[in-house]
């Protein structure tokens, strides 16, 4: 059970407000995509506030048959004692784009912790294609957050999964850089036959170690992570196009590596601000879409 993770041992006390996981603090979202003759549709939608999805929209000019879904929260952020669960299921030959309405703010905490049980369970059938590109995560002072993502993917399917972690509210008051208590993220992928592909887990506890040391964040403030699960032929071609960058003048660094078991690619980027980090992720996202689907990525919205 995610709440029993070792890094949460010191955060088991109950909030003085609503109890952990009670009504309004136990969100659930299930998205099921199916193929219709003319396009992919959002055929299954189960939601429990504060997570909300209204409907799929088809605004992507590069892929007009691609359902685009924005996940909305009416809670103003993730609070102590919250328990969120998200399930995304793609049937064979489907395509989908899932994002969030805005940045995910993990509010300041004085008791317990919050989980986004991104036990996110993501399942991709044969020849399916999913872009999961949420907005950044902003952990506030003393926040504690754990997320776990379990992916089951067919060998012919493709997943583009990204996350961007901010250092905190950088421009709030005198600044909050790495003032959160805990951020833990685990990602595990397996094929549909049960074969495990890889697991990545990182735990950040700024009070227990210098996050700004060499080998961690260094002098950077924003961390971006893109996981591309795709057939080896696509991964090989994309890997040859990605050159590592380390440019302190521009405040950006990135690089790519191959995932174990020919699962795909891992792309990591560090920056001083969120915009350059997201732009670097978008560049890889665009190249991956072009490689896998042959479609282009439309220009970014001015407000994105």
From Swiss-Prot:
Keywords attached to this entry: Chaperone, Cytoplasm, Nickel insertion
One GO molecular-function entry: nickel cation binding
Pfam families cross-referenced by the UniProt entry: UreD
GO cellular component terms attached to this protein's record: cytoplasm
InterPro entries: UreD
Compartments (UniProt record): Cytoplasm
Tree of life domain: Bacteria
Family listed: Belongs to the UreD family.
Purpose of the protein: Required for maturation of urease via the functional incorporation of the urease nickel metallocenter.
Assembly and oligomerization: UreD, UreF and UreG form a complex that acts as a GTP-hydrolysis-dependent molecular chaperone, activating the urease apoprotein by helping to assemble the nickel containing metallocenter of UreC. The UreE protein probably delivers the nickel.
UniProt name for this protein: Urease accessory protein UreD 2
